[in-house]
Amino acid sequence: MDELMGKTCSYFYPRPTLGSLSDKKALFGGYPTQEQVYLLESIGVEWFVDLTLGNEKRTTPYIIQNKEKYITFPIMDQRVPENIIEFVKFINKLVNIISGLTDCEKLYIHCKGGHGRSGLIAATLLCVMDEISPEKAIKETTLSHPQTKAQCNFLHYLFGSQNINNDSLLSPYSHHQVIIVCGKTETVFKSASDAVYYLLHNSSGKSDYFIRCVEFVLDNKFQQHPSCKQQLLQTGFRQLQCRLGQNCIGTICIKLRNKYYNNLEV
């Protein structure tokens, strides 16, 4: 193991400052030789995540015991992912895999040199799984694996905040018709806000009805207008902020975004 740790790869989850070495589930680093693959498998690595383009210089394809546990997500060297939606789906898949690892199983993420691309993925996973800031995640992962400025900026963007104004495609006030079906009656509203007002006006007045009503209407809006739903998914892991109603709209949008991502095929 000394041949790998500190040279070719490092543990990143749980974080090095938390738990014992036996608790570690995920590693990241450089493109492994076949001999290093055998060594990684001997310490419990079952999943291999390859971030290279597949034809990069000075890389030789390797063989693992279970081909079904080999995952690829190509990112150009020193670059960032081009498609945020596909990237979030990929990260969610890794989160599910890591969360389901048994005590003796591990996952290894690698690029070519074991610096920028694999470090970016490791830092993103820490932000999601440990709910830490990009600054802290970068600090945890760049000591041995420095990332490029563009990759650090991408991480800050991915977990930044975004305001929802009245003209936003995410807002109930945008000019997008919404069709609401209540029983056998189908009603067309000029906007989601009109639909919310109508439903509230005809409600029984329960305390939590407003939140449920806004969520119901926005869900209908996003499902009926793919461009709005696409815009929501493009926000990645960003915090959504709206001044109205103690940010209930932002909270609802994040909830719906998570729901849509869970329903997407990975």
UniProtKB/Swiss-Prot annotation:
Entry keyword annotation includes Chloroplast: no
GO molecular function: protein tyrosine phosphatase activity
Matches recorded under InterPro entries: Prot-tyrosine_phosphatase-like, PTP-SAK, Tyr_Pase_AS, Tyr_Pase_dom, TYR_PHOSPHATASE_DUAL_dom
Positions annotated as active site in the UniProt record: 111
Pfam families, per database record: PTP-SAK
Keywords linked to the UniProt accession: Hydrolase, Protein phosphatase
Catalysed reactions listed for this entry: O-phospho-L-tyrosyl-[protein] + H2O = L-tyrosyl-[protein] + phosphate
Superkingdom, taxonomy of origin: Viruses
Catalytic activity, EC: 3.1.3.48
Family classification: Belongs to the protein-tyrosine phosphatase family.
Official protein name in the record: Putative tyrosine phosphatase 197R
Gene source species: Invertebrate iridescent virus 6 (IIV-6)
